[in-house]
Amino acid sequence: MQGDPDVLRLLNEQLTSELTAINQYFLHSKMQDNWGFTELAAHTRAESFDEMRHAEEITDRILLLDGLPNYQRIGSLRIGQTLREQFEADLAIEYDVLNRLKPGIVMCREKQDTTSAVLLEKIVADEEEHIDYLETQLELMDKLGEELYSAQCVSRPPT
């Protein structure tokens, strides 16, 4: 089934974003684990896997539309050197996604590609949940201070 070139372009742009996010979140999770924030690292790693599922769904859609998924392109990673910087970097990538997808969903509907629009709406819903989580972490960091917030993220050995 031949897909619209504009829809395929949008899907490949989003694929690039997902591939970038996978790597950024995965590296952040490994850094967090190395710093001793194992529970936080597990959450960040799960976010990386969520982005991988998005990439898989987008890849499947591109292939169904007789397009070629571009796995050779990846955006610049924004790697934070502190928890705050990591949250801010991850938040920035999520807002980039929303700014691309919201008008993209409208375009898909205008091109009569409801299935792609629904897929992208699902991704937007997932990203909005992640934005809420990241904003909450930054708010907690502001209220508690970075040291107390960080202390809450350290895993305690079992007793």
Swiss-Prot record:
CDD domains recorded: Bacterioferritin
Domain of life: Bacteria
InterPro entries assigned: Bacterioferritin, Ferritin-like, Ferritin-like_diiron, Ferritin-like_SF, Ferritin_DPS_dom
One Pfam family here: Ferritin
EC id: 1.16.3.1
Residues at which heme b binds: M52
Keywords linked to the UniProt accession: Cytoplasm, Heme, Iron, Iron storage, Metal-binding, Oxidoreductase, Virulence
Residue ranges of domain Ferritin-like diiron in the record: 1-145
Claim: Heme is one of the keywords in the record: yes
Catalytic activity, reaction form: 4 Fe(2+) + O2 + 4 H(+) = 4 Fe(3+) + 2 H2O; Fe(2+)(in) = Fe(2+)(out)
Compartments, as annotated in UniProt: Cytoplasm
Textual note on the cofactor: Binds 1 heme b (iron(II)-protoporphyrin IX) group per dimer.
Consequences of knocking out this gene: A single deletion is slightly more sensitive to oxidative stress (cumene hydroperoxide and plumbagin). A double bfrA-bfrB mutant grows 40% less well in the presence of an iron chelator, is more sensitive to oxidative stress, has significantly reduced pathological effects in guinea pigs and a marked reduction in its survival in human macrophages.
UniProt cofactor(s): heme b
CC per GO annotation: cytosol; extracellular region; plasma membrane
Top-level enzyme category: oxidoreductase
Residues binding Fe cation 1, per UniProt: E18, E51, H54, E127
One GO BP: response to iron ion
UniProt keyword annotation of Cytoplasm present: yes
Residues bound to Fe cation 2: E51, E94, E127, H130
Family per record: Belongs to the ferritin-like superfamily. Bacterioferritin family.
NCBIfam families noted in UniProt: bfr (TIGR00754)
Free-text function comment from the UniProt entry: Iron-storage protein, whose ferroxidase center binds Fe(2+), oxidizes it using dioxygen to Fe(3+), and participates in the subsequent Fe(3+) oxide mineral core formation within the central cavity of the BFR protein shell.
Protein name stated in the entry: Bacterioferritin BfrA
Species whose genome carries this gene: Mycobacterium tuberculosis (strain ATCC 25618 / H37Rv)
Taxonomic lineage from the root: Bacteria, Bacillati, Actinomycetota, Actinomycetes, Mycobacteriales
Gene: bfr
